[in-house]
């Protein structure tokens, strides 16, 4: 089976996909995107969270064939995704997710290397966007010290970014609910909550 879909804004084609193959396997083994982690393979831990047409999903539970013609955003694409939001809503603080991104916008999002955009798979590149630029939520996780072993971090980043996009001023209860599907054994969650609070505060201040 051949599957055509977009990954981080770039059209991709996966050949010889077997019927039971998961999106997680395709991303890691066929697309060379190891950010989404393979842990429980039962949709319990959230380490493999990606956005499918803008909606957070556990990629271990999504059959590869289900993404035909659809848009997938992984942790590797978060920085460019945030820049796309800012481009769509300039001056509104939307690089950190304040304005939201429609499914239509996500589906029309295209990497544009000739304008100096970063590589949409690795998040690296040059031109107008410095190499290895981070999204606001990624920077907040670093600044708040919210990373230890890092295995759960990609899923947490994707889930937190989506939550801040639709809810730019979340309460602690909102944050806990949004991240309830993401498990962490290291941090006790407090630093993770601090990071999301920090990202929310920065976007409300337009930082």
Each predicted region: which residue ranges?
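Signature of N-terminal electron-transfer/Fe-S-associated modules in redox systems
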Residues: 1-207
């Amino acid at each position: 089976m051949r599957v055509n879909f977009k990954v981080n804004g770039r059209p991709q084609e996966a050949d010889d996909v077997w019927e039971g193959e998961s999106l997680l396997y395709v991303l890691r083994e066929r697309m060379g995107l190891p950010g989404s982690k393979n842990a429980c393979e039962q949709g319990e831990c959230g380490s493999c969270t990606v956005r499918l047409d803008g909606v957070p999903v556990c990629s271990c539970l999504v059959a590869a064939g289900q993404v035909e013609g659809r848009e997938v955003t992984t942790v590797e694409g978060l920085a460019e995704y945030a820049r796309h939001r800012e481009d769509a809503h300039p001056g509104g603080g939307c690089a950190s997710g304040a304005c939201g991104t429609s499914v239509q916008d996500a589906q029309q999002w295209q990497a544009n290397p000739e304008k100096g955009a970063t590589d949409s798979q690795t998040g690296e590149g040059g031109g107008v966007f410095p190499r290895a630029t981070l999204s606001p939520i990624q920077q907040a996780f670093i600044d708040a010290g919210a990373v230890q072993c890092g295995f759960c971090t990609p899923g947490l980043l994707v889930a937190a970014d989506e939550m801040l996009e639709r809810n730019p001023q979340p309460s602690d209860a909102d944050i806990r609910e949004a991240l309830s599907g993401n498990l962490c054994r290291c941090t006790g969650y407090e630093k993770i909550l601090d990071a999301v609070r920090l990202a929310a505060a920065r976007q409300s201040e337009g930082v």
